[in-house]
Amino acid sequence: MSGLSRIGVAIDSDLLDKFDSLIGQRGYTNRSEAFRDLIRDELVEKTWESPESQVVGTVTLVYDHHVRLLNEKLTGIQHDFHHSILSTLHVHLDHDNCLEVLVVRGRSADVRKVADVLISTKGVKHGRLTITTTGAEMK
């Protein structure tokens, strides 16, 4: 256990029961790793706040490909932001709807900008940006 510090935490028993249930459902074998992951999540979220932070993530879009010129608009936007987009995946969900997942990387501000432009495009039914860390600062 070199490099690890032991700490004590006082927590309401009802809350602890709920936490134990949650971590059991997620497959944690002990509370320590679950607490470490909670802390890591908060630290990663904090990095998003700085517009200069390097982040990686995904932009997920659902749209009707029959909407006039929507495919062309989305492709044009992607080319405008080619420096932030590493890869795309296109899935035909059914006869009308498509799912597009873009892997993005760069400054937090740039990643948010490309996501905002894509998600707000008329005809996009749903969109979501999910950001995580590049892992460089994580141990």
UniProtKB/Swiss-Prot annotation:
Cofactor: Ni(2+)
UniProt entry tagged with the keyword Endoplasmic reticulum: no
Protein family (similarity comment): Belongs to the transcriptional regulatory CopG/NikR family.
Name of this protein: Putative nickel-responsive regulator
Keywords in alphabetical order: DNA-binding, Metal-binding, Nickel, Transcription, Transcription regulation
SUPFAM superfamilies, per database record: ACT-like, Ribbon-helix-helix
GO MF entry, a single one: DNA binding
Lineage summary: Bacteria, Pseudomonadati, Acidobacteriota, Terriglobia, Bryobacterales
Binding residue positions for Ni(2+): 79, 90, 92, 98
Keyword Ribonucleoprotein: no
